[in-house]
Amino acid sequence: MIFKPMQHKAAGLPHNPLKAIVAPRPIGWIASRGSDNSINLAPYSFFNALSDDPAMVMFSVQTDSPYHYKDSLRNVEETGEFVVNIVGEAQFDSMNISSGNFPYGDNEFIHAGLEMVDSDSISVPRVGKVPAALECVHYETLHLPRNAQGGGYIVVIGTVTSIYIDDAVI
């Protein structure tokens, strides 16, 4: 079987298989701080490492219009820092809570009952008790082509400045 992207239904497939083909697909639980010092925490299913030397990662933000930015993207572009928290099984419920549609400035750490731990190299806190976290400074933002409905994705690339790993997973 061969078909064009986003034409999976015409090929008889009920769901787009791209997300299942490129697997495993880790969740990047992105913590960021706005220029007003508000803290945001949100999960992103399009996240991955890009290189190890220099250490770089990316996450991709879905937008419904060219004029609406999600809080994580807004914060990273304002302050230039973010933390990629790696979600452990113990954090699944909290991660789901943090994916809620909260107003800008609401702290998802508080909504989800999570501990904020100071980072080593940046001002954005990481989630306490995660298996690992990557402290990052913003490197570049890429605006991918928009779809026919005007939505699309914006890719945020960061340089890793410090790596936290829970001793229990080493």
State what each model feature region is.
Residues 1-170:
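Basic, polyanion-binding surface patches
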